[in-house]
Amino acid sequence: VLAGGLSTEREVSLRSGKACFEAIERLGYKAELIDIQGFSEIELLTEYKPDLAFLVTHGDFGEDGRLQGMLDWLSVPFTGSSAAASSLCMDKYLAKMVFKKEGLPTSECELNYEGAQLEVLKEKLHSERLFIKTRRGGSSIGAKELKTQADLDEKQTELEEWLIEPLVVGREITLGFIKMKGEWKELPILELKAKNEFYDYEAKYTEGMTQFILPAPMSEERREQLVS
């Protein structure tokens, strides 16, 4: 089980890694939990010769294709997406361009730029309410609704690249798929109701801050629409 990493999501990854490690051991498998902080820890895998690397890493290095590429180089099978897919999807802007090309519904967006004006962005994105998030980060770190020009100006002083989108209001639904014996199977549909203004870092990782409803209540027609 590979966890930790070098990103701002390191703490979350370590907690998730510990939980996965304990679950895998309960299932009767022999497992090792490795805190990834660089290539030296990855080299340990040549000694362990694992049947599988279970990835619980987040953010830079862990989800951006670099770790996946190193595991490919070491011929170590791993969970999750390929190095190429990980690299693409870590960049929200590039991922959205691919989604649009493939005909998948996704909101319009703008990259934050020096001197950006909130009212101009509202006109460009045809929305009175805008939301900003990091271009490459995760766990909703730094994400917020842009209510004033000061909110936007604050982001100009940070080193991150930012993505600005219309604020989408609706139910928070998660639907996962798993491939078993060559066939894709959908997992139960989950609905999340955060106590905060949106499903932010605190709501995601603080016990009691989010209500999880499984399965999510919905019509069969809606369920089939989501699955398809």
Model-inferred region functions:
Residues V1-A84, L88-M90, L94, Y113-V120:
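ATP-binding N-terminal substructure of ATP-dependent carboxylate-amine bond-forming enzymes
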Residues V1-A3, L45, L88-R171:
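Active-site nucleotide/adenylate-binding loops and adjacent lid/helix of ATP-dependent enzymes
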Residues S13, Q225-L226:
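Conserved anionic group-binding/transfer micro-motifs
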Residues K147-Q225:
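Phosphate-binding site of ATP-dependent enzymes
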Residues K30-E32, P77, P105-E108, K185:
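Conserved beta-strand segments of alpha/beta enzyme cores
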Residues S75-P77, H126, G182-E183:
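Glycine-enriched alpha-helix->loop->beta-strand junction motifs that scaffold or abut catalytic
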